[in-house]
Every structure is written in structure tokens, then in C-alpha cells.
Amino acid sequence: MGQYVSIAASDGSGRFDAYLALPASGKGPGVVIGQEIFGVNANMRAVADLYAEEGYVALVPDLFWRLQPGVDLGYDEAAFAKAIELFQRIDLDAAVDDIAACIEHLRQREEVVHAGIGFVGFCMGGKLAYLAATRTDVSCSVGYYGMDIEALLDEAKQIKGRLVLHFAEQDAYCPQQARDAILPCLRNLPKTELYLYPGVDHAFARVGGMHFDRPAYLMAHERSIAALKREIGPNFDLSALWDEHVRHEFDTRDVAATMATMVAEPYVNHVPTLTGGVGQRELSRFYRHHFIHGNPPDMTLTPISRTVGALQVVDEFVMRFTHSCEIDWLLPGVPPTGRFVEIPMLGVVRFRGDRLYHEHIYWDQAGVLVQIGLLEPQGLPVAGVESARKLLDESLPSNRLMARWAASEGLGL
């Protein structure tokens, strides 16, 4: 939970409130969050809390304070009408000055560990993200579905830091005509990133909103955090953090230590069997009773490749074991067969800050069933242990399952 702080306006006209959220470590780079037209409501506070979980000192200023302090609106018809009325009356120049005051406020806070400050804005805040990039010394400014930016392109030459803009293809507030003006003007500027999300509408990143689109939201969030990390951090050794998590899963087999590497509400999904859990309680139960103490004693993981991004680790590996016990998460309900199994696997592991947020683990379940004798491969386009062997030895023949492969021998290329 965050707290409210009071900030002095740079023009001496008064003070305004801002919601402040701190990371678990108590310190981190500073980020100003630009509100939607609905004020510093529960959604914007949740955004600040999310950025705090990512490792930032996040500050959401009340940018309507000169009109009506403490605006906190929902999303019904009356609230929307009120929000539009406030947006039409706000002095955006003064709002940018307030953002500059917030940037300076963060720099002066002992919790902020980097002189560079970021800005992330949504809707009205998305427009202000562009203005913050052109009029302040913000190190990285990220705007989601800002409107009317096309009318401000003469300021583009003043951009000094990194600018990231997320556009929604179906956004009536920033339609194709507007984007046709914005994109050619900005795309070739240094440290400028422009992203278009097909098939989504304005406010696609508002969790729980009528236009919320989870895939677009996740992709945009990853790009936003990556841009912030490039300019102001924080930078964590995600590879080492993932290794520590796996060590507790398979070596120390310590449930508490495993859970300690994860966020407060983690999510694990073994995709072929839909096993895992959501949240501390369910996932702790899963790890304790169905995973950590339920794996064969000879289970090993052989790493093949690892890709480390801004927020996630993608691991390619081969798992080997003797099917000497029932493995609830991998072969639920299947008695031990005593067969030795080799499985090519892929893990997509996402982090928030220095804690693991989710795991998506993929493998070919048909290949596993072939190896333990529960699926006859004859006449089916499936492979058994050959899949793992081919992953480790590229010289093994390809296309053995393609009946028509021989027919193309000698044909033109």
C-alpha cells in the first residue's frame, strides 16, 4: 500500500497531493505516473503499485488539483462526463510544470537511487508523456494511447531522452489519420520507439476495463519496462535469480525458499497438463504436495539455451528421469511405468523486479506418452525420445515422419 505526499507547485500557486508507492527494497529509480482523465483513482494507484513491484519509486500526481483537488472517478456514464469536462478545462502547460515539480521531488527523495527519472502516462497522461519528453529533462517518457499529439509535432526537435509511444489501432482518439502524421515525424528520432497494437482500442492497458486486452497489455508493459531499464534501471541478474529458484525446486527441495523467490501473487502453469497454481496459497500447496517432493530422485535438467530479456528468461532444456513414481504435475493419474524418459522443454519465466512473477512451461505431451508406452506412435505424426536426441544432435535425420519426403528427392529447388 502506498501513501499520499504533498508537493509544492513550481509557480508558487499552492500544493498538490500525489500517491507514492515504494518498492519492497525501499529504494529504486523514480517514475512519475501520468493519470487518465479519471483522476488518481484506484486504477492509477494500482499502476503505481505495479511499478513499485517492478522496483520503482512510483509517484502519481493529482493533475486536476487546480480545478478540483482529489478527483477519484469510476467509469460509469456520469463519471465519464465529469472526466471529459475536467480534461477540456485542464491547463496542460501547468500540468507539465507540475510533472517537472514531481521529477524534482523524486530526485530529492532519499528512496530514489538514480538521478534520471522516468514518466509513464495513460490517456491524458499519454499526451503528457510526449510533452514531458519535449519540455522536461525526463530520462525516459512512455505514453499509452495519447491523444492530439499530432498537433504538437513542432516540439519533437526538443526531445532529449528516450520516448516510447503505444498506439491502439482502433483508437478513435488517435485514428489512422493522426498516426499517419505522428509516425513519420517521430520514427527516425534517436531513442524513440513507436508501437502499434492491432485490433485493440483506447485504454487497452486498463486492467478490468471494457477495452482491456491482455496480450497487448503484457507486450506494451514489457516494452515500457525495457525502455525504463535502459535509461534508469533497475537492472537485476534475472538469470541468476531463475537459477536460484530452480535450485530450491530441484536441489534443496525447499518449499519456503522456492516461494521466497516469487512475488506475493505468483502464477505457474505447466501448459500441457494445466498444473501449477495462482497466488501464494494455491501455489504453496502445489509445490509442497504435488511438485517439489513428488519428483523422481534421478530427475535432471540439461540446459540447451537461455535468452534473457528485460523482464523474462526463456530456457530451452532437456528433462530426464526414470518414471519411478506418479508425477502429479507431468503425468497426473498415471502409475509409474519404470521407463526412462527424456523430454525437450521450454520455460518462459517472467519477473517483476527481482522476484519471479510467472512460469509458463511447455513440452510435447504426446512424446512423453510414447516413451512410457501409453501411446502407440505408429501412423501418428508424433515422436518419442527422438525429439530430445535431435535437440542435442542436429546431425540426426530430419523429416522421418513425412511420408512424402522421399518423393521430393531430386526435384528442383
What annotation goes with each model-predicted range?
Residues 1-258, 266-267, 272:
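N-terminal cap/leader regions of alpha/beta-hydrolase-fold enzymes
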Residues 169, 205, 209-413:
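C-terminal and inter-domain tail/linker signature
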